[in-house]
Amino acid sequence: MDELPFGEAALEQALAEVCEMDAALLTDIEDMLQLINNQDSDFPGLFDAPYAGGETGDTGPSSPGASSPESFSSPASLGSSLEAFLGGPKVTPAPLSPPPSAPTAVKMYPSVPPFSPGPGIKEEPVPLTILQPPAPQPSPGTLLPPSFPPPPVQLSPAPVLGYSSLPSGFSGTLPGNTQQTPSSLPLGSTPGISPTPLHTQVQSSAAQQPPPASAAPRMSTVASQIQQVPVVLQPHFIKADSLLLTAVKTDTGATMKTAGINTLAPGTAVQAGPLQTLVSGGTILATVPLVVDTDKLPIHRLAAGGKALGSAQSRGEKRTAHNAIEKRYRSSINDKIVELKDLVVGTEAKLNKSAVLRKAIDYIRFLQHSNQKLKQENLTLRSAHKSKSLKDLVSACGSGGGTDVSMEGMKPEVVETLTPPPSDAGSPSQSSPLSLGSRGSSSGGSDSEPDSPAFEDNQVKAQRLPSHSRGMLDRSRLALCVLVFLCLTCNPLASLFGWGILTPSDASGVHRSSGRSMLEAESRDGSNWTQWLLPPLVWLANGLLVLACLALLFVYGEPVTRPHSGPAVHFWRHRKQADLDLARGDFAQAAQQLWLALQALGRPLPTSNLDLACSLLWNLVRHLLQRLWVGRWLAGQAGGLQRDYRLRKDARASARDAAVVYHKLHQLHAMGKYTGGHLVASNLALSALNLAECAGDAISMATLAEIYVAAALRVKTSLPRALHFLTRFFLSSARQACLAQSGAVPLAMQWLCHPVGHRFFVDGDWAVHGAPQESLYSVAGNPVDPLAQVTRLFCEHLLERALNCIAQPSPGAADGDREFSDALGYLQLLNSCSDAVGAPACSFSVSSSMATTTGTDPVAKWWASLTAVVIHWLRRDEEAAERLYPLVEHIPQVLQETERPLPRAALYSFKAARALLDHRKVESSPASLAICEKASGYLRDSLASTSTASSIDKAMQLLLCDLLLVARTSLWRRQQSAASAQGAHGTSNGPQASALELRGFQHDLSSLRRLAQSFRPAMRRVFLHEATARLMAGASPARTHQLLDRSLRRRAGSSGKGGAAAELEPRPTWREHTEALLLASCYLPPAFLSAPGQRVSMLAEAARTVEKLGDHRLLLDCQQMLLRLGGGTTVTSS
C-alpha cells in the first residue's frame, strides 16, 4: 500500500508553523473593528426570502442531501484540501498514533431530526466534494491552497452545518434547503479556526463520471479518517455584527479545474465568488464558494449569491419569480383548453382558444336540449304504452306489418342523435343535418373548425324510404294526368278495336271473286253485331283506365308516414328544430328545417322550373277534382282500398302535418322570410289547401279556415285584378268551415265576416310587406303571419273612418246624429279587432294558429278610447265619457317612448278638455289653462314636424285642435251665462274674456288655419271659431255676423243649383249649424236680426237640431233661454 500524501509528520509540521498571513489578518481585524457599521443597510441580502428561518437538520443517509460514494474525487485530491482545512486536532484510525500538538479533542454532537421542508420549498440533493491534489507533485491545473499553522487558541465545540456521520464519507447540505437562519449559527463560539481556503464543487451525479477503480482503497481509507471532522460551511451567510473580509479572490472560478474534477455538463451554471471570511468575537469563519447546477435548484435560489449587490437585483428576482408563476398558470390553462379541444372537436383539429370555448358551450347546450327532448319522448312513449292493452298491441303488430315499428325495434341509424349545432362562425353547414348544405342557403363556416369526433360516425344517414310510403312525384302525377286526357280525347282503344275487327273483312275483300257467296252475308251480320257492342266496351275500358289512374294518383300515389317510423322521426326532428328557430327569430334556418321536414314526408319541394310548373299544374288539377268531391273521396282512401281504419287515420294525420308545414312556408314567403316568386308562393298555398281538405277531421277547423284565408291573400297579392273575385270564394269557404264545426268564427277572423271588413279585404287597396312599417296607431303583430299585418291595416282603416265621420261626414246624412253613431260603430269594431292583432306569446310554433292564439294591441285600443271620449264630449254625454277615462289616462309605453309629439298632444288635450268641459266648474283655474297651453304647444310641434303627414294624422290633428277650441269656448260661455243671468235681456252684457284666454284661443285658431291649408275639411271649422274669437274679444259685430251667416246659409243654399264651385268649400254639418244658431241668437245685437221674433225662432230651430243630435243638456239650456225670451214657449220634436 502506497504511503499516504498526508502523514503524521507532515501534519505536525504544518500545524506547528506560524503563518504570516494570520498575523496580518489579526492586525487588520484590530484596525477595522473600530469602523464596523451595524446597520442593516450594509447587508441588504441578509433578511431576504431564501434566508428565512427554519429548523436546522442534518442530512441523513436516506435524505436527498446525502452524498453517495460516487460523488467524491480520488484520494489524491482529498489530501491537500483536508490538510489545509484541519486546523486543530483530528481523530485518526487505529494504526496511526495521535499527534502531540493536538491536545483538544473534537466533541461530536448528536444528530438532529430530519428537516421537513415547508410548503413551497423544494429539496435539492447537493453533493459536496473536497478536493486536494497530491502533496509531492501536483498535477497540472490543480489549485494548491496554502497551509497555515494553527492559531494559539483552542477549538471550541461548535455545531457543524450540514454535517452527518456516515461510514464512508460526509455530506454538506445547502443552507437554503435546510432553512437555517443566520441567527441560529453559533459563530461567536467557534474559536481556533484559521482562515483556510476551501474549494468545493456541487454538481449532479448524472453529470459526474465515477472515479477510477484503482482509487477505491485510498477512497475508503481517507473516508474513514475524516468521518469525524467537523466542517463549517457558510456560503454568503453573514450577520450584522460581523466583518466581511476577502482573503483570496477567484476571478476565474467558473472555468478552473483540478486533478479530480470532471468537466461540468452542458447547461450547468457555475456560481463563483471570492473566499469570504467572517470575523466575530475573535473567531474567523471561512465561507465556501459553490458550483451550483441550475437545473436542480428553484428559481429563487439561482441568484442568491448576488443579493448583496443591491435592491435592483432583488426586484429582478421577484419579477422573475412572478413571471414563472404566471407561466405555470398559463401552462395549466392551456393544457386544460387543449384537453377540452380533444374532447369536443378531436385531436386533429386546429382551433384557437375562443373557438374551443364556443364549441364547448354549443355542445353543452345541445346536450341539454337533447336530454330534455329525450325525456319528453320517453314520457310520451310510456304514457302511450300504458294506455294500450295487450290486445291492441297484438292487433297493431298484425295489421301494421313491417311499417309500424316501435321505437325499441328501430335501427340504430334511425334513432341516432343529432350532431350539435354549428357555432356562429364555426363548422360548415354540411356537417349537421339541421342545415341544408345542398341548397346553399345556409352560411358556410370555416374549414379550421371541424365537427365533434364524438358525432362524426353517428350523423344521420339518408335512408331509402319504403316504396309504398314515398309516393309519386308531382311531375309523374302530371304525366299520368296528361296520359288520361289523351286517352279520353284521342280514344286509342276504339281505333285499336276497330282495326282488329275490320282486318278479316278487308282481307276477304281482297281475294273475293265476282260471283255470289253465301259467306259474305254471314260476315256482314257478324260485323253489325260487333259494331253495336264495340262502343260500350271501349268507353268501359276508358272508364276503367281513368279510375285506375285516379286510384294510382290519389290512393296509392299519396305518401303515408306511419307513427314511430323512420320518416316520422326525421320529420318531427326537423319540425321541432324549426319551432326553435322560429322562436329565436332565425327564419331562414326555420325555412330550411321545414324544407327538410317535407322531404322526410316524401313531399320534396320543386327545385327546378320544370318541377315547379308540373307541381303547380298538378295542384290546380287536384283542386278542381276536390271541388267535385271525387278527389277528396279518393284522397280519403289513401294507403289502400282495403278497410284499414288505422292506416286511413295515419294517412289523414300525414296529410295534416304536410299541410301545416306548407302553410307555414307560405306564411314565411308572404312575409319575405322565404325566397321565391309568385309561382312558388301559389304552389305552396295550393298544396297546403289541398292537403288540408284531404286531412278531414284530423285538422282543426280554425287551421283550415286560416289556410283558406291565406289562399285568399295569395289571390289578392299574386293574381291579376280580374281574378280577385276568387278571394270571395275562399273567404266564404273559410266562413263555412268555421260555422260547420263549432258555429262560431274565431276571434282573429271575426272582422272578415263583418261587411266592413269583408269589403276592405276584397276591395281595399293594401299590400303585405315583408318588414312591417312603423305606425303611430298600432303595433306590429306576429312577424310570420300575414293575416296579422292585414288586421293591423284594417284597424288603422277603422280609426281613419271614425275620424272622417266627424271631420267630413257623408253629404247625404239626413239624420244629424248619424255621424256620431257611425264613428262609434267603427270604434267598437276597432276595439274587437285590437284584441286579435297583437303578437301572442306562443305564435312562433309551426302548429300554432293565428285563429286560436291571439294577443292585444294596446296602442290601437288607446287611440280608439281617446276618440270615443272626444265623441262623447261633443255629444255632451259625460257619463259615457267617464267610463273610458281610465283607459285614456294610462298611455302605452310605446307611445311614451316615441319622439313624435302627436301622442303627447292627444294626452294633454284630453286632460285640458276634461278640466275645462266640466259643467260643475264655473271659473277657470290657472292649472287647467296651463295644461291647455301645454297641449297647444305639443299640437303646434306636431303640425310643424309632419309636413307630409298621412290623412289619418291630419284627421287626428283636426280633432284635437277642434277639441281645444271647443273647450275654451265652453269655458267662456259659462262665464257669460253666469254674468248675463242677472240681466233682463238675452244678450250678453257680461265681461269679455281675459287676455290669457284670448291669447290661447288665438294660438289654437292659428293652428287650425295652418291645418286647413292642407286638409280641406278643416275650413268650415275655421269660420265658426273665428266668429267665436270676435265675440270673445268684443269686436265689431258686422264681420262676426258675416262669418255666422256663412255657416247658417250654406246649408240652406247647398241643395239648390250645385256645381264645381259649390263643392269647393265643404258644407257645414248639423252640429256646426246648431252652434252658429246658438251664437247668433245669444250674442249678436238685435240690430243684426231681420225681425223682432227671429231670435226666438233661431233658438227653437237650434233646440230641434240639438234634440236630433242627442245633446240633452244643451237642449235643456235652449229651452230655458226660450222661456226667458218668449214667456213659456216650449220646443216639440217635429
From Swiss-Prot:
Molecular function terms, GO-annotated: chromatin binding; DNA binding; DNA-binding transcription activator activity, RNA polymerase II-specific; DNA-binding transcription factor activity; DNA-binding transcription factor activity, RNA polymerase II-specific; nuclear receptor activity; protein dimerization activity; protein kinase binding
Keyword Cytoplasm (UniProt): no
Tissues of expression: Expressed predominantly in brown adipose tissue.
Domain bHLH: 317-367
Site, as annotated: Cleavage: 451-452, 480-481, 519-520
Transmembrane segments: 482-502, 537-557
UniProt keyword list: Activator, Cholesterol metabolism, Cytoplasmic vesicle, DNA-binding, Endoplasmic reticulum, Golgi apparatus, Lipid metabolism, Membrane, Nucleus, Phosphoprotein, Steroid metabolism, Sterol metabolism, Transcription, Transcription regulation, Transmembrane, Transmembrane helix, Ubl conjugation
Record's GO cellular component terms: cytoplasm; endoplasmic reticulum membrane; ER to Golgi transport vesicle membrane; Golgi membrane; membrane; nucleoplasm; nucleus; protein-containing complex
Polar residues composition bias: residue spans: 165-202
UniProt cross-references to InterPro entries, sorted A to Z: bHLH_dom, HLH_DNA-bd_sf
Pfam families cross-referenced by the UniProt entry: HLH
Segments in the Lumenal topological domain: 503-536
UniProt region (Transcriptional activation (acidic)), positions on chain: 1-60
Modification after translation (UniProt): Phosphorylated by AMPK, leading to suppress protein processing and nuclear translocation, and repress target gene expression. Phosphorylation at Ser-395 by SIK1 represses activity possibly by inhibiting DNA-binding.
Entry remark concerning the domains of this protein: The 9aaTAD motif is a transactivation domain present in a large number of yeast and animal transcription factors.
Family designation: Belongs to the SREBP family.
UniProt protein name: Sterol regulatory element-binding protein 1
Native source species: Rattus norvegicus (Rat)
Lineage of the organism: Eukaryota, Metazoa, Chordata, Craniata, Vertebrata
